[in-house]
Every structure is written in structure tokens, then in C-alpha cells.
Amino acid sequence: MGRLRFVVLLSIFPIKTFSEPCSTMALVLRDSIKISEFINLSASEKLLPSALTAVKSVRISKVDKIISYENDTLSDIDLLKGVKLVENGYVCLAGLVVTGEWNLPDNCKGGVSICLVDKRMKRANEATLGSYHTSACKKRFTFKIIPNYSVTTADALKGIWQVMINIRGVEMEKGFCPLSLEFVSICVVYLNNIKLGLREKILNVTEGGPTELTEAVVDEFVEKVPMAARLKSFRSVNKKKPSDSSKFVNGKSRLNSRNKLNYENGDSDVGISVVDDIVVGNGVSDIRIDDDCESFDAQSDPY
């Protein structure tokens, strides 16, 4: 009788499967991005309300995507996409996870150098925050960079980060995309300068891991030129070029789309929001495409 009743209940309430919309377009495995890999918060910061601590929230940004069409590009990247900032406050860029995928057949020659840039800094060696090198035969790759420094909310809203992509040895016709990159950042938002006793602790990177923060050349295809020298040369060349006209997608300008950052005043919840967005890197300019079908809200990150 009990088994029969169980079968009847199953027939009345059919089992449904829920899937994330458009999830197949994302290269980044969101479940693998853990805040604990980048920062350690004190017990008071975990348990007390945000009004009683300097740290207001720890957040994972939305996904920003770059499609590379040229061998040398310097494109703006929104590392705080979807992060709610505190007015007149600060945000610490604790960590960055980058995932790339080569859109090439197997066993292709060549490779790429990727460099994160703070465009506020005039000296090229001070503007480079980290670099990574890999070959085209490695179809998919992931690496982490730990900038671990803070900027004001006012500076963050101006979009101060860029990514320099240097592809070498890949023989492909112009107008096609050899490489796709996705970026997700881990940020700490706070109102006042965190005291030394409360400051977040960045975990060390194990030797032999995927992170690379040096200028060392690890692949034969990479020319023996430091990324800082490449950035200085790239900037000097582009200063001589006339600025491109603004480009629009679906009636929205690229600049307006980039500045869509929200504020919060004392939000005590730790929120995680992830969404895909596409930026097409074309020389120095790029086009941003908003795709609402890939957006969703994730659950709060437990500590």
C-alpha cells in the first residue's frame, strides 16, 4: 500500500529538471571560482553586520568576454561589471580569473601573451599587473592574477583596466577569431580604509600553478620582449593614430554600457551575480554586446 501511494504521488507531481539558460556559451566554470582561494576574512567580518565592519561586501563580478580578431590589441575590460560599489568608498581588486579557448583545429602552431594593464599609470612597467603566456596547441587554459590593491569608487567608475593581447605565429585570414577570453574578478567593497588588523589576507600561490606574475618567457613563439616594453611601444604607436568614432550596438553606445555600475549604501549581504557579456576587441576600440538571455543571479556565497 505504501509503495502504491508513492507511485501515485510521483504521477501527480512530475519531476522537472532545471537548467541554466544559455549556459553553454560560457567558457568560465563558475562553480570553480571560490572566494576562499583569494581572501581570508576575520571572524568579525564574517559574523558582524556590515555597519559594524569596514568590509561592506565581497563580490564576484559578472563575466566580461573579449573576442580577439587581431594579433595585437589593447582593449578596455570591465573587471567590476555588476559589482555594487559604495559611494565615496573603495574597492579592492583581490583576484582575477581568466579563461581562454583557442578557436582553432588541433596541433596549430603559435601562441599568445596576455597582460593585465592599469591604464592610469604612465610608466609601462608600473602599469602591467601580470602576464601569462601559452601556446595554441593548449586548446583551453585558465590562470589567476592577484593584483591585491584598492582604488576609489570614483576611479573604478572610469573603467581603469585594460587587457593587452599579443598573438604570434597563428596563420589565419583577417576577419576571423582565433581566441576567446573571459574574465571574472573577486572584489572587496568597503567604505573606509581597512586597518592593518582587518585587512584581507591574500593566499600564496603554489609553485607550478597556472598563475604567472613575472615577465619570464616560457614558450618559444614569444619574442624576447617584456610585456612592459610591448605596452610602452603599443601606447606610443596608438597616440599617433586618429581616434575612432563611437560605435553603437542595438542603439546603445559602448561607453554607456560600460558605465552601468550600481551603488549600494551599507548592504550587509554578500552577493554574487554572474552574467555573460561580449566585448569584441578590434584594435584599440571594441564593441560591447549585452545579452540578457545569459544573465542570472547566484546565491550568496557562504563563509
UniProtKB/Swiss-Prot annotation:
Keywords: Host cell junction, Host cytoplasm, Host cytoskeleton, RNA-binding, Transport, Viral movement protein. It is found in: Host cytoplasm, Host cytoskeleton; Host cell junction, Host plasmodesma. GO terms for molecular function: RNA binding. GO terms for biological process: transport of virus in host, cell to cell. InterPro entries: TMV_movement, Viral_movement. One of its GO terms (cellular component) is host cell plasmodesma. Belongs to the tobamovirus movement protein family. Transports viral genome to neighboring plant cells directly through plasmosdesmata, without any budding. The movement protein allows efficient cell to cell propagation, by bypassing the host cell wall barrier. Forms a ribonucleoprotein complex with viral RNA. Binds microtubules and modulates microtubule stability. Can bind double-stranded DNA. This is Movement protein. It comes from Odontoglossum ringspot virus (isolate Singapore 1) (ORSV). The lineage of its organism: Viruses, Riboviria, Orthornavirae, Kitrinoviricota, Alsuviricetes.
